[in-house]
Amino acid sequence: MGASASVPERSVHQFTVKDSSGKDLNMSIYQGKVLLIVNVASKCGFTETNYTQLTELYRKYKDQDFEILAFPCNQFLYQEPGTSQEAHEFACERFKAEYPVFQKVRVNGQNAAPIYKFLKASKPTFLGSRIKWNFTKFLVGKDGLVIDRYGTMVTPLSIEKDIKKALEDA
């Protein structure tokens, strides 16, 4: 879903995504905010570190126009096997996530969510645009453009300086 069939999206604000209960959410509500968009999974070896640090970052910067947007994904060894609602409950109950956890998406392939097609095209890696694993992170500026992309091994707290810089930029 996006702006129109003939006009390619130019920012994340032009997309519509679904929340964990399946309701449409227009991403334009995030205009003027710095976003960290992450594909998450509850049964991954990187789950504990990432969710813990995402919650810490969110608590620290949520009052400074910062949002974390978590998109559960079951494409990597089926490590998010439950429903979207179960993924939401897992994040909120176990890790006290106060940020949005959306409907499960595909991040790679023909049926990848349109927002993920945009994110990957905006910041491909030297190995191509394909997302390699859970907890790939995209830092998005207040203008809705992708600032940077971080792989699984990059912890949320290690990109705090980039988040601060994005928050300071007009």
Swiss-Prot record:
Gene Ontology CC annotations of this record: cytosol; endomembrane system
Catalytic residue list: C44
Matching Gene3D superfamilies: Glutaredoxin
SUPFAM superfamilies found in the cross-reference section: Thioredoxin-like
EC number, as in UniProt: 1.11.1.9
Keyword terms, alphabetized: Oxidoreductase, Peroxidase
Family, similarity comment: Belongs to the glutathione peroxidase family.
PANTHER family tied to this protein: GLUTATHIONE PEROXIDASE, GLUTATHIONE PEROXIDASE 4-RELATED
Protein's job: May constitute a glutathione peroxidase-like protective system against oxidative stresses.
MF terms (GO), sorted A to Z: glutathione peroxidase activity
Gene: GPX4
Protein's recorded name: Probable glutathione peroxidase 4
Swiss-Prot/TrEMBL catalytic activity: 2 glutathione + H2O2 = glutathione disulfide + 2 H2O
Keyword Oxidoreductase: yes
